[in-house]
Amino acid sequence: MKRFITVCAISAAMTAGTAFAETVKVGYMTTLSGGAGIIGKQMQNAVNLAMEHKGGKLGGMDAEIIFADDQRKPDVAKQLANRLMKSDRVDVVAGVIWSNLLMAIHKLSLIHI
């Protein structure tokens, strides 16, 4: 299910709001520290490998991936999601592993649509 949501989010980023953009920006927020950090690090390595394999492109567009460590904390996830959407101006936020973190940020994404 998480993989499906990630694929949908990336697909949406490539079609909505980026039609005239030169680069699609993806905020990849995942758990990179603590005991569960190994999962997020493996995901980060997979994303980096895929980007290398695809020549830094998503759907034929240049892509920039901004990684962020949510520390598996809902309050940190909210702050990071806000920063990624407002300051970094990402087209999509992906990579969230834990449902409690997704629940913490899902309303923010509706505000920024």
Show where each model-derived region lies:
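Bacterial N-terminal signal peptides that target proteins for export
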Residues: 1-6
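Bacterial N-terminal signal peptides
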Residues: 7-15
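Sec/Tat signal peptide C-region and signal peptidase I cleavage site
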Residues: 17-21
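Extracytoplasmic "Venus flytrap"
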Residues: 27-46, 68-75, 97-100
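Periplasmic-binding protein-like
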Residues: 28, 84, 88-97
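Signal peptide-proximal N-terminal region
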Residues: 44-67
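Structural motif
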Residues: 63-87
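Conserved small/polar residues in nucleotide/adenosyl-binding loops
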Residues: 111-113
